[in-house]
């Protein structure tokens, strides 16, 4: 479209022309196109650094979750609380299980409160050297051990019972078989007697060195350890079913060599199924220690449904009929 300017105002042509230019400017300029349409791509300005939205960069993109930012799933290792100083504090129960309330003065309470060495400590032999196999234990108990090769597997369990009965003043229950029908009653020892062994015969004889002190208890145990073992211990047990397992029970194979491990804690599910911890001494004489479970080494609990025979522990495999209860755990 073309405009033809005709001014009919005499003497005012310049003024009228200037007004016409102003009108054209307000209407988008002069020419055939008129105003620029915004939907006409040919009329959009070329992009510049100032008006382009920047592409996302590594710093501006929300990162994908990584292994360190994702909350880990619970694992079997979560049942071990390394700062724990006692059996109960160190070993948490598995999901779905709970410990029954422990009554003071019971073997369960005694063992749950039993002090442990710091996590990661090695098992030491009676002479202070390291045991060769350091991969079998989950914790080391602070059970006393003397500087001689006597307190081995059965002896360690007798030591646990003797310490418990002595501390709770149940002296009449400290009594162990030496074989051949001879029973080493600690109460008799406390009354001023000792045991004389000659060949296969043992008998009580008076002794001024025997009394009710703790030092005298250790002398009594030293003699018991020298003349007893898994064979005599097995004779003081009875078979039990796995669903009846409780603290103080044992898996035992009597003989020479034999072996025995002890149940030191038990927890239960609501349906009554149990899980338990095992501990042992061994030969040569060594510190009493909580065992790992070879089925899942990061979780030391043994589960009732896993008890099948042969029953495997880290350093010994037990046959059917080995789960038993000691007469002094009645």
Language-model region placement:
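...with weaker cross-activation on analogous glycine-rich loops/strands in unrelated enzymes
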Residues: 214-272
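Intrinsically disordered, low-complexity proline-rich tandem-repeat tracts
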Residues: 45-47, 54-56, 63-65, 72-74
